[in-house]
């Protein structure tokens, strides 16, 4: 699974000792989802880190969303975390990686006890256009260069008071590095993220917040 790993996962922007304290001091994942997490760690599959899990649990508890959209299922860990926190919510999750889809189907089949989660297979750009209704929470954890492309469709799908969450936006701090100093194969990703920041961070159409959780979490809400 090495090709699925995020090289920025182990480059915390926040002081490493503080990250470790946050991850070890807050309530740990137990039971069935601990098995999913264990598999991810043993196989170097990127899933949301523990400090982000805790934040999601708090946020979802407060928002009580009826419908959640996730772009980037991976092995289904984050979708299962969300399902556990809001047992009455419908969760639609999208992925196109056959290897991840196979693992996600296995995990959802075992642990999605209330059949809350709908897995859609294929390119998110196509599937997003086919979705109907609105979503109260939209979580993007997929190709970072595509976030800016997905944003207009996500905004159309977002409920009036809904929130969009975009993961891994710090890229280990490389967002501060001049483009030409970044490895060539990472430049498209960085350009996509910078276009996103130019669009949303100082735009009166949006309320935004950047949280230093994991490799950076961007929150967007319609103003």
Identify what each model region corresponds to:
Residues 1-139, 144-165, 169-223:
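A short alpha-helical cap/connector motif
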């Amino acid at each position: 699974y090495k090709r699925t790993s995020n090289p920025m996962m182990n480059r915390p922007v926040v002081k490493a000792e503080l990250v470790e304290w946050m991850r070890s001091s807050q309530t740990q994942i137990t039971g069935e989802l601990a098995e999913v997490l264990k598999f991810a760690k043993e196989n170097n599959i990127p899933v949301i880190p523990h400090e982000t899990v805790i934040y999601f649990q708090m946020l979802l508890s407060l928002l009580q969303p009826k419908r959640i959209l996730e772009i980037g299922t991976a092995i289904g860990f984050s979708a299962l975390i969300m399902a556990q926190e809001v047992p009455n919510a419908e969760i639609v999750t999208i992925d196109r990686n056959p290897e991840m889809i196979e693992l996600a189907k296995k995990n959802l089949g075992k642990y999605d006890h209330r059949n809350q989660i709908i897995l859609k297979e294929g390119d998110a750009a196509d599937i997003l256009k086919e979705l109907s209704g609105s979503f109260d929470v939209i979580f993007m954890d997929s190709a970072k260069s595509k976030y800016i492309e997905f944003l207009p469709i996500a905004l159309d799908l977002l409920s009036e008071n809904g929130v969009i969450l975009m993961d891994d936006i710090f890229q280990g701090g490389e967002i501060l590095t001049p483009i030409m100093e970044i490895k060539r194969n990472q430049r498209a990703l960085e350009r996509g993220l910078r276009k996103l920041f130019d669009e949303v961070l100082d735009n009166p159409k949006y309320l935004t917040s950047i949280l230093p959780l994991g490799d950076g979490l961007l929150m967007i809400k319609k103003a």
